[in-house]
């Protein structure tokens, strides 16, 4: 989740080893070898999900919805456990924010909401919505829900882009 600091390795090490040592002593068993997979703290910032804006719809007196060409099949975290994410319109980085918008996925599910009430410049069909902080769990948790295809992956390094996984097809 963007903005939420990942717990440090030393935080985890202290919390886990203290309990393991105590329990091993209590049960008179030898200490095991401990290996920690730091996950999010290493790769979360390495991934940015890019979506194309479709329809922008106003529900009078309620809110504005921005539909995108992805959703809960490629980023389940907001629907599954309420992960909070940020986003920008990549092609309007210098434009002034004009209001709050709710980013809705393409699946016909009431829970397919990526971000609620985010301040953005005026979104229009064809704009590119960039969601940072997607490197840790979006790809491993992606599914083929509702017959959707898993997304392509592009590696960008030193100003050069390379397709490293094609989008799925039939």
Enumerate the predicted regions with their spans:
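Active-site-proximal beta-alpha loop/turn segments in soluble metabolic enzymes
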Residues: 1-9, 38-42
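Alpha-helix-loop-beta-strand connector modules within alpha/beta enzyme cores
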Residues: 12-24
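Charged (often Lys/Glu-rich) extended helix/loop segments that serve as interaction or gating elements
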Residues: 15, 29-170
